Amino acid sequence: LATSNSVPKASNINAQVRTDGIVSVDVLDHVAYSDGTTVKLKNNLQYDKETFKGLAFVSGDTVRYQASSETGNFPITYTVEDNLGNVASANITITVHKSDAASKAAPTPHDAEAQVAAGQKVRIPITLTGIDTDGDDDQLLGLGNKAPTLGRISEVGSDYLVYEAYPDSSGTDTFSYAVEDWTGQRTKAQIRVGVFQGSSDSGVYARDDEITLRPNTAATVPVAQNDISGDNTNLTVDKHVEVQGLDGVSVKDNMISFTTPGSATTDYIAYTVKDKAGLSDTATLTVNVDPNAAIEPPTAYDYRVPSAATIDKKSVDVDVSQWIANPSGTANELKVGVHPSASAHAHVKGGEHSTTITVDRTARARAVPYTVTNTKYNITSTEFIQVPAYGVFPPTLRPKAPELKVNSRETIEININDYVRVGAGKEPYIERADSVSATKASNSDVDVNDETRKYTAAKDYAGPASITFTAVDGKQGSDKTKIINSAVITLQITVIGRDVPPPTFSSSTIDVEAGADPKTVALTAPTNA
């Protein structure tokens, strides 16, 4: 919040969370500061170590808190500083209430929007933080009670959905997604995807980076993290870089490594990122060398273990290497650990430089705080690994299931046991006939019983299609205490047309400098056949 005042003003904040829950407070939303200045949350939270219960730490511009099993009010003092050196402090009072499944309010997920060209995919991020007054531990289940009609969901991640638009679609596709809290309450929100005909932009956009380091500092910079691929594919950093003022610059694993000179200066590295087609863009990494440069804490991010990765496992191994970085040095200076509060159920697997953490699963979902320490300067950052509960998981897609292909106008019969995985000793069923919907089918009346269904492809279509239904892992019968788990499942189908449609192309812009070396582009990569 920018004002005309010369000194930042921090406000007191109140937050609440259940016992053993997590809450995140965006501090800068409660700070007023002058126009033209920037404000940063300092990494020095203050609280009474004798009476304080729980775990509190700074993560970027937020204060995060994990409650213990004790209720009460726990104040924390936070401090912000602007770029002129002015500081201000205020209190966050966190009220921890007892976990109570009977009275807990349901989560309130947010609606989401996206747009995509026909025939293309788009990743839709789903916000799971701040949607529940009881804490930030809700789980994304996937689709809700309404499936898309202009495309299909091709992937369900721990905090995102991937939507694939059909090649002949246009308009607005409206469907729902579902989340579940720790008590089992499920709520839904809406997703709107604008699908347009015409070429999508498959270009590559490299963004400039800037870093400030002390003299004689070895550093590794993941320059591609903020670069963009128009078709959402991974980018690679070209081995050839142009360097001004630095020696020993190298590229490995899409990161640029170098050592700063021994005195204050500003140097530059021009680098190129490419997609799988060979489309590329160039950006500049500016390296400021300052003897008084601040030592930044390691960067780290949360990781939510997908339910599908935990099936029949009493423990899970999580490699956090792709979620951590060292903005003030090299990755070799980082050490991964587990916060003492979680040591009874988690530990680092392997040697001293291991980045893999083993988490034991328990009867309830667990958030394990892991630490990343810059061993050269002894600065530590903390984030969470969220692990589903042991023994109970909803039906999920069976890995490596056979592909579903059908000729247009023809019919295939699908046994859901071949495509849906459930717990040991259980069988998958379709919950209700009215939960089944199909796209690119000859009619909307899908022939179905609770174990098999038929799909008849439309006569004048070729391309991706789908069938969606609610799967359960048992039948209630007369045992009303039996726990039945359910999930909305989408099976991807490929319809083979009688006539092969012409391929479509994603538009691309290729910049070639006069007199420079030629560029090679693989035309098959931006082509959809």
Question: Which sequence ranges carry the predicted segments?
Answer:
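Extracellular/luminal low-complexity segments enriched in Ser/Thr/Pro
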Residues: 1, 62-72, 160-170, 255-268, ...
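Extracellular interdomain linkers/hinges and stalk-like, low-complexity segments
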Residues: 1-36, 77-135, 176-178, 182-230, ...
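Surface-exposed coil/turn segments at beta-strand junctions on protein surfaces, enriched
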Residues: 18, 58, 69-71, 117, ...
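Feature targets compositionally biased, intrinsically disordered low-complexity regions
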Residues: 20, 53, 59, 71, ...
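N-terminal start-of-chain detector that recognizes signal peptides
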Residues: 37, 49-51, 67, 133-136, ...
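Solvent-exposed loop segments of extracellular immunoglobulin-like
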Residues: 37-43, 136-142, 231-238, 329-337, ...
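Low-complexity "stalk/linker" and mucin-like segments enriched in Ser/Thr/Pro/Ala/Gly
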Residues: 45-60, 144-159, 239-254, 338-353, ...
